[in-house]
Structures are given as structure tokens and as C-alpha cells.
């Protein structure tokens, strides 16, 4: 958008399956923009989550000078998801791209120069990582950040906002009501700030709904398909609860508990059953009964 003329200059399309854009930032020089979003594999049946079968978590790089999408890379690794990326920022020295991974309560720190160098080589057909399989498959390669990214556990719950002052990195826990500070490779200072949402069933349910660590390898949370307070991702998914081969649009969960039966075909008798089935068959998780009870309270 041209802010002086209040005019749209160009629309840039993210890859097919992109949803839930959460943050955009630029580097210090204004040459590139970085966008966090999810990348759904909605053409596949929902029978597993291994290696990002259903959802992957992405960073798209935009060439601002030429007004085009340069590349999309996955923040995930082959064995571990980086669910629900939220804020992205570039360090003041222009050396790092930092991403708040809200679903797994971590911060991903990427060497910016090495990332751009790796992408330039990959575009020329150079096998830049052991998993490289051609430029057209970069956005499907969970190994693209191998060796150039650090994943730092924060300690708080729901890391949605980050900031940097010099070499000091700050990360805010939305649900835990705290700020964590890292002056190196470890977040070792915690400061309580504001309200801890985990004191109530509704607050805990909200946190569980956004918590990918409940599920297998942290690839996705309930909020991956139902972002923005349990609404819809706008995609068609083929769930197995009513057979294969009949993809249907994701439903908003607003008032689902008050309007049984649930799912498009009414295959679930009520929302309580649907919540527990989702934990088992979409997150591929086994959780204490209190987790589903708290999710019910939130929804």
C-alpha cells in the first residue's frame, strides 16, 4: 500500500494453503519483508501429522524492491513442528530474524544473511541441505533452516510478542502473564506482568486450545484450523469421522456447545464429544480429562 496516496499498489499471493497471517516486518534497510503464517496441506486426508502432513508453519520472504514473493521457508524441522508462529522481527543489527512460536512456547532465531545466501544457492539448484529436493520444493522442505536457526524455549505460555534491545531479547507469555529475558542463548529471567490467565478454567482452556505441545511433535494446535478465537481457517478438509473423499469447509466453533449436533454432517452428537475426538484424532494426543473440560469452558 502506498501510504501517501492511500492506494493499493500490488497484491502478493502467498502459497496455496496459506492461512492465519499473524505478523509482517522489514529488515533494517527495507529491502525485504518477512511474513509469518501457516501453510496447510488441506489436499491430504487428516490421518496423521508426522512431518507436517496436515499443517506446517512458515515464513515468507518478500522482495520489496521488485514487489514479489521471493520464497517461503518452513520454520519446522523434520522431527518437530514450530506451531502457530506469531510476531516476527529483525534484530537492530540486521543479523537475525526472530519469530515467536506461540504454539510451542519458543523463539526461533534465524541467521538472516545465511538464510538469504542459502536461498540464492537453492534457486541455482545447489543442494544446500541434505533434504533439498529442488527450488520448487523449498516450501515443503522442513530441513531448509538446518544449521542456521536456533530454537530457544522461553518458559512462558503462548509466546506472541517479542522485542530486542541491543543483544537482549524479550518474549511475552500471553497466557502466563510474564516477560522472559535472554541475553544469550537461554531465557533465564522471568518477570510477572499483568494477569495470569491460567487461574480460571476458561483461561486454561484458551491456552490448551492454542497449545501445540499437547499434540504429536508440536505441528499444530486446535487454533491452527480454528484461528482467531475458534473461528474457521476457510479451507476444505477431509476428516475421517464421516469417511474419506468428502472434504468440507472448516466450521466456526462459536456457539457449537449450544447447538448440537456438531460437524457439517452432524456426525458428532455434541461439542463435548467433538472436542475429545479432536484431541485424539487431530492432535493425536492423550491428555488428562481436565484438558478437555477446560476447553469446553473456553468454547
Language-model region placement:
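Periplasmic c-type cytochrome electron-transfer domains
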Residues: 1-11, 20-51, 55-58, 62-299
